[in-house]
């Protein structure tokens, strides 16, 4: 549903204050129209007469839905609508608690954590340790060994994918970082 009011304003989308309920309705609509056949919808934010999306999705019951966020509301949305959860900037000490909460919410929806594809977005800076806001080391930064250990921690928690990103805009440094990732770290995980 987003987290920056400036993005909502720039895109001239529905108001930022109601982004959660708007996103919930969009997810309901998306899942319904992907199923094929005519769909009508009557929600608080969206209403439409019978319409059909053609061709229907070949993925059943709908294409995968990866939902990001670490708040309780985001986790509820994952449990109700998602086929996967993407955590971003999640302190490793909070992973067990967030996974436990997500598991509880999944159970309320007749699901388990095993039903979800767990993904983490990790910003990398191999060879340069960077501080996090709490004064510790930011995950994904530091030596080859340290970053390798960070990735293994996510694997140990059941994550099946990690999306790597270099936070800078220097193309040469970005290429160097991903070469290091491919050559020095990926063979170890």
Model-found features: residue ranges?
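Active-site-adjacent structural elements that line small-molecule/cofactor binding pockets in enzymes
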Residues: 1-189
């Amino acid at each position: 549903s987003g987290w920056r009011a400036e993005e909502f304003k720039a895109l001239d989308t529905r108001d930022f204050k109601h982004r959660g309920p708007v996103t919930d309705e969009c997810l309901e609509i998306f899942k319904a129209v992907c199923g094929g056949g005519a769909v009508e919808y009557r929600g608080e934010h969206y209403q439409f007469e019978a319409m059909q999306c053609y061709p229907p999705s070949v993925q059943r019951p709908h294409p995968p839905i990866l939902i990001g966020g670490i708040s309780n509301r985001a986790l509820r949305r994952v449990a109700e609508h998602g086929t996967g959860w993407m955590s971003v900037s999640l302190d490793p000490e909070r992973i067990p608690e967030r996974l436990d909460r997500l598991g509880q919410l999944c159970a309320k929806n007749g699901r388990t954590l095993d039903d979800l594809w767990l993904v983490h977005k990790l910003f990398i800076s191999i060879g340069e340790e960077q501080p996090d806001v709490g004064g510790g080391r930011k995950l994904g930064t530091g030596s080859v060994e340290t970053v390798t250990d960070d990735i293994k921690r996510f694997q140990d928690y059941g994550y099946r994918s990690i999306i790597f990103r270099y936070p800078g805009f220097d193309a040469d440094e970005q290429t160097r970082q991903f070469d290091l990732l491919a050559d020095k770290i990926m063979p170890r995980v």
